[in-house]
């Protein structure tokens, strides 16, 4: 259980509740969650964040009607800046997108502008939206996270309760610059406790991080209840606090749910996240 899973900011969410699906446009379906909800306990404040970054969403189930009533389909790419006051709750995002299904729009640009306006209002930040026709994406290869995978270690684990203490004393010795990857990240939805599966890329420069300790730390998220974005910020904050690298970037790509995948990244250096879906996305 997290320290804030009964917080009043979560009380009005449709997540975890029986919901009617609407197929005509309704921007009021979108619901935001204050980023401060998990940042305050971590000692992170909007005016002095130790990182920059964004939440990258892929919208796989996006459809509307053109001016003549002919259905249109697209794949959407959305970026919410880490500086927005709110993150967008994913079930509300899905319900909102469903409301486009039987709504007529004059053009693709109108759809993109509507998404940009509504998501920016919900997040209280400047959101970027791009729409892609299917033939623009056909033949696109499966992407991979660059780096050394740390998953094949011959270690025994019997504790799956979250603990940042696994990182205590994890960094020592000479300064290195490396990128590590794990596909074993699994956390749970803050409200429903349904599993969230992800791959995480950690790029840093600093004292070498012990890979066994890092893997034990990542595996300890297995019973942890937080939203995707919150988990990435926690990982960044914990590594920065315990390992004190000169530079650090954390990027996670989660499997899709409800036609959406969420891919947050946070960095205090020069980092450009690779886009493109992974094998499990």
From Swiss-Prot:
Residues where substrate binds: 88-90, 228-229
Keywords noted in UniProt: Cytoplasm, NADP, Oxidoreductase, Queuosine biosynthesis
Q: Which EC number(s) does the record attach to this protein?
A: 1.7.1.13
One biological process term in Gene Ontology: tRNA modification
Instruction: List, alphabetically, the SUPFAM superfamilies matched.
Output: Tetrahydrobiopterin biosynthesis enzymes-like
Q: Where in the cell is it found?
A: Cytoplasm
Q: Which GO terms describe its molecular function?
A: preQ1 synthase activity
> What residues sit in the active site?
189, 196
Where on the tree of life does the source sit, at the highest rank? Answer: Bacteria
Q: Does the keyword Ribonucleoprotein apply?
A: no
Q: Which reaction does it catalyse?
A: 7-aminomethyl-7-carbaguanine + 2 NADP(+) = 7-cyano-7-deazaguanine + 2 NADPH + 3 H(+)
Q: Which GO terms describe its cellular component?
A: cytoplasm
Indicate whether NADP appears among the record's keywords: yes
Q: Which residues bind NADPH?
A: 90-91, 257-258
Query: Could you list the residue ranges forming a coiled coil in this record?
Result: none
Pathway listed: tRNA modification; tRNA-queuosine biosynthesis
Q: Give the InterPro entries listed for this entry.
A: GTP-CH-I_C/QueF, NADPH_dep_7-cyano-7-deazaG_red, QueF, QueF_N, QueF_type2
Per UniProt, the enzyme's principal EC class comes to oxidoreductase
Similarity-based family: Belongs to the GTP cyclohydrolase I family. QueF type 2 subfamily.
Record's function text: Catalyzes the NADPH-dependent reduction of 7-cyano-7-deazaguanine (preQ0) to 7-aminomethyl-7-deazaguanine (preQ1).
Q: Check the record and name the HAMAP family matching this protein.
A: QueF_type2
Instruction: Quote the subunit structure annotation.
Output: Homodimer.
User: What protein am I looking at?
Assistant: NADPH-dependent 7-cyano-7-deazaguanine reductase
